[in-house]
Amino acid sequence: MNDRQAALDQALKQIEKQFGKGSIMKLGEHSDQNISTISSGSLALDIALGVGGYPRGRIIEVYGPESSGKTTVALHAIAEVQAQGGTAAFIDAEHALDPAYAKNLGVNIDELLLSQPDTGEQALEIAEALVRSGAVDMLVIDSVAALVPRAEIEGEMGDAHVGLQARLMSQALRKLSGVINKSKTIAIFINQIREKVGVMFGNPEITPGGRALKFYSTVRLEVRRAEQLKQGTDVMGNKTKIKVVKNKVAPPFRIAEVDIMYGEGISREGELVDMAAEVDVINKSGSWYSYKEERIGQGRENAKQYLKEHTDIRDEISKRVREEYEIDGTNKEPLDENEETLSLLDDE
């Protein structure tokens, strides 16, 4: 047994000498066993994710039909990162980012790094450079479907380019996955959906860009509109369902229901009323909502408005709900610079 241990120790020393300290270790000796997260900016989504937010150093895919709220979900996460003093980058391959809308959602557009690349290769090279810097906490690519390979852009309109985009994504993710994990960057890939022709049974919907992103993603979120939210005859927004279809860090298939209001994004008050009523932090009797035996509104919309006007009570309820769901922020790490991440460029 001693000979085997001595041989193992020798092998470990050789590996560390060749590949550097920390290249191999016992899992129990790893200092960062808990998954550190950054809030998604939505209480309901934080709860559905199971760990209180997006896991750092992982790849997230957000997909769904057009105008379902995919970019809104990503922008809320950027606002949350910036609120904690972190740096965020947005690679706008669709050339469709609305700065005014982003500002309404709480994004500091003066500090947001923005790139509008010409080709898919350029977009992914920029993404790699940003991640390797070790100084970017969140990177959003909008969208995978718009990452057009250079050969397709330079070719004729009717030319066939079978599998080019899938190969591009597969190669990029092979390069990015390791360095994303080391740098603790959250990489959010927004994706569209397409339909397979001739599918008789099962779901005909697929996401562009091949299968690689499905495999490399730690979390996959499906965003879909459920119903319109009306005030009288005016449509004010949409009730949206966000389904966690894949989750490597917590149980999957949980669903978050949020109100996405036009021009405002996710209504924090709306999801707070729903989640608080679910765990009896807010009491619902008939159509009346009450907190600590004090009525806060008749009907959901009035309760939302009350919380919007009384931010101290809203924050108190939010804290209690997070404690009930055991996502009180104990797994949050400060977004500060460290020697390990900032030396990623030097190691190459």
From Swiss-Prot:
Single GO cellular component term: cytosol
Claim: Cytoplasm is one of the keywords in the record: yes
Protein keywords: ATP-binding, Cytoplasm, DNA damage, DNA recombination, DNA repair, DNA-binding, Nucleotide-binding, SOS response
GO MF term set: ATP binding; ATP hydrolysis activity; ATP-dependent DNA damage sensor activity; damaged DNA binding; single-stranded DNA binding
Pfam families, alphabetized: RecA (PF00154), RecA_C (PF21096)
Record SMART domains: AAA (SM00382)
UniProt biased composition (Acidic residues): 336-348
Keyword Cytoplasm on entry: yes
One biological process term in Gene Ontology: SOS response
Region (Disordered): 326-348
CDD domains tied to this protein: RecA
Matching PROSITE patterns: RECA_1 (PS00321), RECA_2 (PS50162), RECA_3 (PS50163)
Basic and acidic residues composition bias: residue spans: 326-335
Domain of life: Bacteria
Residue sites binding ATP per the record: G64, P65, E66, S67, S68, G69, K70, T71
Cellular compartment(s): Cytoplasm
InterPro entries in alphabetical order: AAA+_ATPase, DNA_recomb/repair_RecA, DNA_recomb/repair_RecA_CS, P-loop_NTPase, RecA-like_C, RecA-like_N, RecA_ATP-bd, RecA_C_sf
Family: Belongs to the RecA family.
Role, per record: Can catalyze the hydrolysis of ATP in the presence of single-stranded DNA, the ATP-dependent uptake of single-stranded DNA by duplex DNA, and the ATP-dependent hybridization of homologous single-stranded DNAs. It interacts with LexA causing its activation and leading to its autocatalytic cleavage.
HAMAP family for the chain: RecA (MF_00268)
Protein name in the entry: Protein RecA
